[in-house]
A protein has these predicted regions:
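Short, charged N-terminal beta->alpha structural module
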Residues: 1-31
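Short acidic, S/G/P-rich loop/turn micro-motifs used as interaction or catalytic elements
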Residues: 11-14, 33-34, 56-66, 93-95
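A short, well-structured beta->alpha microelement
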Residues: 20-48, 112-117
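Conserved beta-strand-loop-alpha-helix hinge of the TIR/SEFIR fold
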Residues: 47-72, 82
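Hydrophobic/aromatic ligand-binding patch that stacks against planar heteroaromatic rings
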Residues: 77-78
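Proline-centered loop/turn at the N-terminus of a beta-strand
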Residues: 83-87
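Glycine-rich, charge-decorated loop segments at or immediately adjacent to ligand/cofactor-binding or catalytic sites
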Residues: 88-106
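A charged, well-structured terminal subsegment
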Residues: 114-128
Length: 128
């Protein structure tokens, strides 16, 4: 069964190509700043994706500087409500620091080393 992967701008094209070659679809998702596709806050039950992938800097914005823009908590909320796993590509050596930037990281969010992204994404997609 075809699954859909929402990806933030800059996501590794090799990863996306591998997932397409496995029979999945990809959909660009915008963080609100880059206009890179459907705005992440517009994801709902009718247009939900099966997996979101991206980088920490695509969901993390200094809230005091940009109070009216979507925050990582908005992304986490969407992931929790619709059961969408979020893979954030972070080198293993930086994962603890990345996690400390984001308060209340839900279990549905994983920090994944770049070398493991394809494997982890396929495992999630195959288990759904």
């Amino acid at each position: 069964m075809r699954k859909s992967i929402g990806y933030f701008e800059g996501t590794d094209s090799t990863l996306l190509t591998a997932l397409v070659c496995e029979g999945h679809d990809t959909l660009p998702v915008s963080n609100g700043f880059d206009s890179h596709g459907m705005h992440v806050r517009l994801i709902n039950e009718q247009n939900r994706v099966d997996l979101l992938v991206g980088y920490v800097h695509k969901i993390f914005a200094p809230e005091p500087l940009l109070p009216h823009q979507p925050s990582y908590q908005d992304v986490f909320h969407i992931c929790r409500i619709y059961g969408i796993p979020l893979l954030l590509e972070v080198p293993e050596a930086l994962q603890e620091k990345a996690a400390s930037l984001l308060e209340g990281v839900p279990d549905i969010v994983q920090f994944v080393d770049p070398a493991d992204m394809e494997r982890v994404a396929k495992e999630i997609l195959n288990d759904q």
